[in-house]
Amino acid sequence: MSERIFIGVAWPYANSQLHLGHVAGAYLPADIFARYHRTRGDEVLMVSGSDMHGTPITIRAEQEGITAAEVAERYHQRFMASWPKLGISWDFYTSTATANHARTAQEMFLSLYEKGYIYKNTVCQPFCSHCNRFLPDRYVEGTCPHCKYEGARGDQCDNCGKPLNAAELLNFRCKNCGNPPEFRETEHFFLKLSAFEEELIRWVETKTHWRTNVLNFTLRYLKEGLKDRAITRDLDWGVPLPLPGYEGKRLYVWFEAVIGYLSASKEWAASKGQPNAWQKYWGGDTKSYYFIGKDNIPFHTIIWPAMLMGKGGLNLPYDVPSNEYLTTESQKFSKSRNNAIWVDDVLSRYGVDTLRYLLSANMPESSDTDFSWREFVRRNNDELVATYGNLAQRVLTMVCRNYDNKVPEYGELDERSLTLIEKTAAMLCETDKALYNCNFREAIRLAMALAQEANRYLDEKAPWKEIKVDKAAAARSLYVAMVALSGLRVAFYPFLPESSGRLSTYLGFGSELEKESWILKMPVVGQELTPPEPLFKKLEDSVVEEETARMGL
Ligand SMILES: Nc1ncnc2c1ncn2[C@@H]1O[C@H](COP(=O)(O)OP(=O)(O)OP(=O)(O)O)[C@@H](O)[C@H]1O
Ligand SMILES: [Zn+2]
């Protein structure tokens, strides 16, 4: 039975270009999941957009001496150019700078305000007398009170993932001038998170299908007790408050950005000329998945669900399959720390499927994972080229050369051949299960294992020898290997859409796998074929040194 799946993906801050951490953490797993469900025949809506607001952008603008709008627009355009190169198949990608988003965020604010879930309070906020302004979020740095990490910021600690208030930091200082701020009174609006504590605990306790790290982090956080959080800031960049008298304040970026999932869905519906079409993705038995890196967990398992509970009538997350960090030398890739490997740069030298393969096979699903150029080259050469690509190339070239560019007659199948076909069908069942449960590494491992199995079959049968004595036997071996390839193109499709599309045409099927289904399709005897080009290119070992030198390690 087909399902309806909503996929929300973290909104990247438009303060820098994309690095491999973003891809491995959020965008690639979301895209794999979307492509998989579309191929299964499910209805999918995958949305996100650039986060144009917040202090990461104003800080960058101040550093460069340009406006925040200019910074945000520049990186938004770069993201838009990167997505197709990466093969990220958005149903809709927008930004938080739209009038639709501001309106949706303001409506959410007012709805929660009217129900008493948002209230006003006077608080002490850090104020730098040297810079003469309040210091929101990332304008303050200091030591995390929980894990003692020294580079924690006024909104969150990147090391232990806990959201923070500036006043909780130890040894806090102004990011701009390094002086310790004083605390001054200012009025802010608060989200009454405490009102949702019990409902949230009851809800999270039913989420036994969540990843252990996500579930444990969330429960620990909830059981420490929820504090109400300020959701406005003294800033002039962001979505204005929908109430008169607060012109110098804006909605806090984290309250506002998560609303993007809803506003993007509405904008998608409007763009299709069906303004109500978003509703079916936010109600009924639609399952909502949110793909994010682990620093975003509390915003998606606590704050956003609390907002949705308060508003009512909209689906809560079904799953939040958050990834851990992609690291270099055990440090989180970070724009701000400048230790990143940039997506556009990598894609200017290597194929997109090589990158997607490495990041899928080494995805930081359950622990932080170091990116390694040695692994990049090894997996490309040993697995993509020697195991999978070579299998396709050997089989299809022989078929084209010896059987007049047509899928050959295979006659009667022997035991060994039937076993490979059965294993291929079983692999599709197992990858289906793994992908359904967001076990991406497991799924891609299963597919590559079948490619190895098909190579063993081919080496045993040796059609290049058979053909000299028994052309019909060689035809059978090659046909059965084509059946395995037919299964592989489906299983690899969510991960490696470019090469799967090509393999699909080489096998005589169309290139649009999403129009098929997650089953083993047999190549059609007599179908005309075009001789194949290699699916992947071998990389020189020198790539490891060149790239490591480029990173300055
Ligand atoms: N090294 C990483 N590994 C895994 N996920 C990451 C990594 N860096 C960022 N992400 C995820 O990518 C998404 C978008 O990131 P965002 O633009 O918010 O950057 P960020 O986390 O502030 O990164 P930075 O530290 O580079 O400024 C978020 O869900 C974030 O968790
Ligand atoms: Zn200062």
Swiss-Prot record:
Cofactor: how bound: Binds 1 zinc ion per subunit.
Major site of localization recorded for this protein: cytoplasm
Record localization: Cytoplasm
One GO CC term, this protein: cytosol
Matching CDD domains: Anticodon_Ia_Met (cd07957), MetRS_core (cd00814)
Cofactor: Zn(2+)
Catalysed reactions, semicolon-separated: tRNA(Met) + L-methionine + ATP = L-methionyl-tRNA(Met) + AMP + diphosphate
GO biological process: methionyl-tRNA aminoacylation
Keywords: Aminoacyl-tRNA synthetase, ATP-binding, Cytoplasm, Ligase, Metal-binding, Nucleotide-binding, Protein biosynthesis, Zinc
EC code(s) of this entry: 6.1.1.10
Annotated residues for binding of Zn(2+): C144, C147, C157, C160
GO MF terms held by the record: ATP binding; metal ion binding; methionine-tRNA ligase activity
Annotated Pfam families: Anticodon_3, tRNA-synt_1g
Top-level enzyme category: ligase
Motif ('HIGH' region): 12-22
Protein residues bound to ATP: K335
Motif 'KMSKS' region positions after renumbering to this chain: 332-336
Quaternary structure and partners: Monomer.
Family designation: Belongs to the class-I aminoacyl-tRNA synthetase family. MetG type 1 subfamily.
Function: Is required not only for elongation of protein synthesis but also for the initiation of all mRNA translation through initiator tRNA(fMet) aminoacylation.
Protein name: Methionine--tRNA ligase
Organism this protein belongs to: Dehalococcoides mccartyi (strain CBDB1)
Gene name of the encoded protein: metG
